[in-house]
Amino acid sequence: MKVEVDSFSGAKIYPGRGTLFVRGDSKIFRFQNSKSASLFKQRKNPRRIAWTVLFRKHHKKGITEEVAKKRSRKTVKAQRPITGASLDLIKERRSLKPEVRKANREEKLKANKEKKRAEKAARKAEKAKSAGVQGSKVSKQQAKGAFQKVAATSR
């Protein structure tokens, strides 16, 4: 024998008793009597109606068994080395003072700037060298042998 539970009051519904209400979204509600069905349809909150099971649970009425608190395991963060950096190196970097960190960063930036400047100068020198060899500049159209406009001689 399957005993259902009232969707509103929480009361037991024995076979052959109660009514079934199917909402538009196909959710099924079972009611033990017209009283709980009526209150549900009025959109009353069962936690505020004194005789419902939900009210009794909410207001801690009657005998309730104390539910033992579930113990969750604390997560422990494990330090693992990153590819290309050992644990010692990571710890050393973390313990660096902000001033030292800032100085290192500025030093690296300066080195990068110098490197870029040197590359740019080398490129410029290369360009100047190749420009001297090429000689006079000829447009792409002339190089391809495009039709040359002949100047008018009648005037």
UniProtKB/Swiss-Prot annotation:
The family database entries (PROSITE patterns) matched by this protein are listed as: RIBOSOMAL_L24E (PS01073)
Question: Which superkingdom is the protein from?
Answer: Eukaryota
Q: Its principal location?
A: cytoplasm
Q: Does the keyword Endoplasmic reticulum apply?
A: no
Drop me one GO molecular function for this one.
RNA binding
Protein role: Component of the ribosome, a large ribonucleoprotein complex responsible for the synthesis of proteins in the cell. The small ribosomal subunit (SSU) binds messenger RNAs (mRNAs) and translates the encoded message by selecting cognate aminoacyl-transfer RNA (tRNA) molecules. The large subunit (LSU) contains the ribosomal catalytic site termed the peptidyl transferase center (PTC), which catalyzes the formation of peptide bonds, thereby polymerizing the amino acids delivered by tRNAs into a polypeptide chain.
Q: What is this protein called?
A: Large ribosomal subunit protein eL24B
What is a single cellular component term in the Gene Ontology annotation?
cytosol
Which portions of the chain have biased composition (kind: Basic and acidic residues)?
89-129
What span is annotated as the signal peptide, if there is one? Answer: none
Spell out the coiled coil positions from the record.
none
Q: Which UniProt keywords apply?
A: Cytoplasm, Phosphoprotein, Ribonucleoprotein, Ribosomal protein
Q: Which organism is it from?
A: Saccharomyces cerevisiae (strain ATCC 204508 / S288c)
Q: Which gene encodes it?
A: RPL24B
| Subunit-structure text | Component of the large ribosomal subunit (LSU). Mature yeast ribosomes consist of a small (40S) and a large (60S) subunit. The 40S small subunit contains 1 molecule of ribosomal RNA (18S rRNA) and 33 different proteins (encoded by 57 genes). The large 60S subunit contains 3 rRNA molecules (25S, 5.8S and 5S rRNA) and 46 different proteins (encoded by 81 genes).
Q: Where in the cell is it found?
A: Cytoplasm
What family is this protein classified in?
Belongs to the eukaryotic ribosomal protein eL24 family.
Residues bearing Phosphoserine are S7
